[in-house]
């Protein structure tokens, strides 16, 4: 079972925007460019890169998705207390 992961994410306040961004990404949009333009998370400045983190380091709902969704497939929107996330897991190990 994976204990570490690396992921990108885009965090926005509105679900509609999250859905629109996910659609753009699935249609070939550049995840990192969209993160830089739209994400309200400080990681947006780095293209949404969260770096590598341990299982259990993130809020539970985010953690659950990161450690269960398909790798390299944009997933979301996931609602947490921070807003709506679009997540792309780069790897798990």
UniProtKB/Swiss-Prot annotation:
Q: Where are the transmembrane segments?
A: none
Predominant localisation class:
cytoplasm
Citing just one GO molecular function, the answer is: peptidyl-prolyl cis-trans isomerase activity
Isomerase as a keyword of this entry, yes or no, is yes
Which PROSITE patterns does this entry report, sorted A to Z? Answer: PPIC_PPIASE_1, PPIC_PPIASE_2
The organism's superkingdom is given as Bacteria
Q: Which reaction does it catalyse?
A: [protein]-peptidylproline (omega=180) = [protein]-peptidylproline (omega=0)
Give the matching Pfam families. Answer: Rotamase_3
Spell out the family assignment given in the record's similarity comment.
Belongs to the PpiC/parvulin rotamase family.
Q: What does this protein do?
A: PPIases accelerate the folding of proteins. It prefers amino acid residues with hydrophobic side chains like leucine and phenylalanine in the P1 position of the peptides substrates.
Among PANTHER family, the record links this protein to:
PEPTIDYL-PROLYL CIS-TRANS ISOMERASE, PEPTIDYL-PROLYL CIS-TRANS ISOMERASE C
The molecule here is called Peptidyl-prolyl cis-trans isomerase C
Name its species.
Salmonella typhimurium (strain LT2 / SGSC1412 / ATCC 700720)
Instruction: Recall the taxonomic lineage recorded for the source organism.
Output: Bacteria, Pseudomonadati, Pseudomonadota, Gammaproteobacteria, Enterobacterales
Q: Which gene encodes it?
A: ppiC
């Amino acid at each position: 079972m994976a204990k570490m992961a690396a992921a990108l994410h885009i965090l926005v306040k509105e679900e509609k925007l999250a859905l629109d961004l996910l659609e753009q990404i699935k249609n070939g949009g550049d995840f990192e460019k969209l993160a830089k333009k739209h994400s309200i998370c400080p990681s947006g400045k780095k293209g949404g890169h969260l770096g590598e983190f341990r299982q259990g380091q993130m809020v539970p709902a985010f953690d659950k998705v990161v450690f269960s969704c398909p790798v390299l497939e944009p997933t979301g929107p996931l609602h947490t207390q921070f807003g709506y996330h679009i997540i792309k897991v780069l790897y798990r190990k």
